[in-house]
Structure formats: structure tokens, C-alpha cells
Amino acid sequence: MKPSAKNELTALTARYPSLCVCSGDIESFAVELIRCFESGGKLVVCGNGGSAADALHIAGELLKGFREKRPLTAAESSALSAFGEDGMTLAAGLQRPLPVVSLHGETAFSTAWNNDADPALVYAQHAYALVRRGDVFLGISTSGNAVNVRLAATAAKARGAVTVSLTGQSGGRLAEVSDIRICVPESETYKIQELHLPVYHAVCLCVEKELFGQ
């Protein structure tokens, strides 16, 4: 990992010293994401309530530039420019993305599934459809005991993904099916959420710096 990328994680624990207890797991998550993206994989993420909002937030940071400039490569620009005026517009305006899927956007699927099948399996079905070997699955649950998130993690693990959990102090049952367990040292929901945001911001900054930074 580049020193500048590692510095993002060091800055996290400097600002939030309580996170030192899980700093190794946070770094492991960043390393796995870098490996995943470099090998053509994707991040699949889900949660409930505020954790669903966090999942969407993570996707928003990675699908476009977060803090780094992400200009297209010369080859990408050339390929787009072959499509005339619209291609030139795309070549000038698009940014290099990182592929992330939040399992919260398919309203027609999720409502149909919840109406016709077991609602606890809605994320698992979606993950099973999308996850491939080498991907990373991130399950976010403050308690670690969200059944639908745990089942999705299990489905993703069966597909060959590296599974990561972002939880509160106990880790819950989600931690049992996770290859990497980030258990922030709080037990109240809102306090857990207050630590989840800086964790995933730091990971996104680290990954972006590694892949796009100078």
C-alpha cells in the first residue's frame, strides 16, 4: 500500500483513538477492497435503516471521485471519442469509477420478493444473483444480528466473496460468517453509527488514494 494511502488510516485513529482496537481489521478491509478492484471485482453492500443509508453513502463515494481526481485513461478517452460529439462529451466529463452495488435500489424486485417469498431472504437472493468469486461483500448492522444481512453474507460467502462485517462492539452473529470483522467499540445504536461513518470514509479515501492518487 502507498504511504499516502496508509496515512488515511493513520489519520482515522488519530482523530478517533477509540478505533485503535479495530484498526487492523479496518486496514484488512481496505487491502481486500484494493485487491478486489484491481482484479476486476466489485463491492456489494447492504444494511437496514441507517445502515442502508450508510450502504448508499459508500456507493456514492466510490462510484465517482471522492477526494481524488479520477480522469479517464488515454485508452478510455480514445474509445469514447470514437462516438462523435457525444463520445467527446463523455470522454471529457466521465470519471473512473469503482464498481459498487448497494442492495437497496431494486424496488420492483424487493417488493415482489417480500410479497411472494420470505422477506428475510431478500438481500440474500439479490446477493446470490450478483456476487462472483473475488468480490467483496460488506454487511452493515449496528447489532450484528440483522437476520437478512447475515443471510446475505452467507449467500455471498457461498459464491466466493470475501465477507466483511461493520458492527458494534459485540459483532453479533454477522461476525460469525465474516472473514473480516470491524466491531467498533460502542454498544448504543447511534454511537455505533457515529463511528461507522468515519470508518468507511477512511477506507474509501485509502482505496481511492491507492488506486488514483499520485
Task: Mark where each language-model region is.
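A short, well-structured juxtamembrane/interface segment
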Residues: 21-39
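Glycine-rich phosphate-binding loops that contact phosphosugars or nucleotide phosphates
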Residues: 56-213
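Generic N-terminal amphipathic, Lys/Arg-enriched alpha-helix
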Residues: 1-20
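Structured helix-beta-strand junction loops
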Residues: 39-40, 177
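Hydrophobic alpha-helical transmembrane segments of small proteolipidic membrane proteins, enriched
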Residues: 14-17, 27, 42-43, 157, ...
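Residue-level recognition of alpha-helical structural elements
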Residues: 22-26, 51, 157
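Glycine/serine-rich anion-binding loops at beta->alpha junctions
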Residues: 42-58
